[in-house]
Amino acid sequence: MSETYFITGAQGCIGSWVVKALAERGDTIVIFDRSADSRRLTAIMKPGDIHRLRFVIGDITDAAAIRVALQESSARRVIHLAGLQVPACQAEPAAGALVNVIGTLNVLEAARLAGVERLVYASSAAVFGIGEDDTPLDEGAASEPGTHYGVFKRTNEGNARVYFLTHGLSSVGLRPLTVYGVNRDSGLTSDPTKAMKAAILRVPFHIRFSGATDFQYVRDTAAAFIACADRAPVGAHVFNLHGETVEVASIVNVINEKAGQELVTFSGPPIPIPSAINDAAIRRMLGNLPSTPLEVGIGETMRQFVELREAGRLDTSEIETELRAGGALAR
């Protein structure tokens, strides 16, 4: 039996893969997004699946607009992925809070008023701040975020808990770290995916951070969001998502090996987020979730980029921008 899902930020990276997976199994999808730009959806979805989507243009900072859209959708499940990334929140904290905190409150309130069954939202491993050692952190580890983005995400977790305690709205916040795959094209941790794209274009690329990070294939991330929307128990839950904890050097080696050239380099400080997180809690609740090995995920991503290039549909705008600016190019 198909379900109706209301999705914010559906035209972002994780959102596009969530939509793809839901569409392929025949669910009804209502997309609430401030942009009509569907290039990320068209990059990974079949035209027939895209034609079945319902689009509502709107901004999560507009409380009335999202209330009306969610009510009219008759959706029982909400997946909230809209938000600004770390650089935008650091550059303009007030604007970041308006979108990431007030916008999320608007989604929570709209979900309460619409009587939805469950809301799943994107939190982040950025809530932890910098880890003191390499020990994988569980959900109860101290929350000392080192970015405005991390503070905003931690605030959202608290607000979701209050909405359950006060109104009985069930929710799940998921904390991914470094997500990679087709459509990951914004934010500092998008550099590895951009490097994969640059490599198939035979363009040098420089990743702007070093150290270890928890690296998860976007298809697996999307599957976790959908599993929580479908099966999470009543309550206000927060779970870590874990892929593989690897050194950036290892990622670079895999990309260069698959490209057959030494095109990708890296340097810079580690990202201010723990390098390893523990996902035992979500696996206890939901059982086994997809976990694509790093080399397989990188290989699939690079093959998808090649297929898009050969079809004349590969978006290279972010690579071209950095070519002109000299930003993340190999130095």
Regions flagged by a language model, labelled:
Residues M1-R77:
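N-terminal Rossmann/SDR dinucleotide-binding element
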Residues R154, H167, Y180-T193, V203, ...:
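Glycine/proline-rich active-site loop of Rossmann-fold NAD(P)-dependent oxidoreductases
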Residues I130-D133, E144-V172:
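Active-site Tyr-X1-5-Lys
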Residues A88-G103, L137-P145:
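Short alpha-helical oligomerization interface
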Residues L81-Q85, S123-S124:
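Conserved NAD(P)H cofactor-binding loop of Rossmann-fold oxidoreductase domains
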Residues L105-H148:
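Conserved Rossmann-fold NAD(P)-dependent oxidoreductase catalytic core, especially the SDR/UDP-sugar
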Residues R208-G211, F215-R331:
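C-terminal substrate-binding subdomain of Rossmann-fold SDR/epimerase-dehydratase oxidoreductases
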Residues F128, T147-H148, V172-S190:
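Flexible, glycine-rich beta-alpha linker
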